[in-house]
């Protein structure tokens, strides 16, 4: 399991990555993160919804209500063009970060 402290700065990146493909809602996005990380990272609900609020406030995503199911309407999130640009910036930042950290990480058998 990955510590949430280690990955905190990249929750937004993971969400934006997933929203490139389809609009989605919170529970589905959390399941996709768990699945793609091979269950090494499980995003907490509070972390996820804090990220949605931050991303929407910054214009990186927009939200809308979907059809009502079981008495409740889901909130769907959509990636904006600004969000796609931000995602690409974060990917470049990650590659630089990884390059630097790799210089300090050694793996011994």
What do these predicted regions represent?
Residues 1-5, 65-66:
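Short beta-strand/turn micro-motifs at beta-sheet edges
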Residues 3-47:
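N-terminal helix-turn-helix DNA-binding core of bacterial DNA-binding proteins
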Residues 4-5, 60, 108-109:
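Short, contiguous hydrophobic alpha-helices characteristic of membrane insertion segments
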Residues 17, 31, 50, 88, ...:
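A cross-family signal for key residues in well-ordered alpha-helices
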Residues 48-49, 55:
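Basic amphipathic alpha-helical segments that dock to polyanions
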Residues 56-73:
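Beta-hairpin "wing" of winged helix-turn-helix
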Residues 69-91:
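Basic, amphipathic "hinge/linker" alpha-helix immediately C-terminal to the N-terminal HTH DNA-binding motif
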Residues 85-109:
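Amphipathic alpha-helical dimerization/coiled-coil segments
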């Amino acid at each position: 399991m990955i510590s949430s402290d280690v990955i905190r700065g990249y929750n937004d990146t993971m969400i934006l990555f997933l929203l490139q493909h389809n609009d989605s809602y919170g529970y589905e996005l959390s399941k996709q993160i768990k699945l793609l990380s091979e269950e090494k990272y499980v995003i907490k609900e509070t972390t996820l919804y804090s990220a949605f609020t931050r991303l929407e406030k910054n214009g990186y995503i927009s939200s809308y209500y979907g059809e009502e199911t079981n008495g409740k309407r889901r909130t769907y999130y959509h990636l904006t063009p600004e969000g796609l640009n931000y995602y690409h910036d974060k990917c470049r930042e990650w590659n630089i970060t990884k390059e630097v950290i790799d210089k300090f990480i050694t793996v011994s058998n």
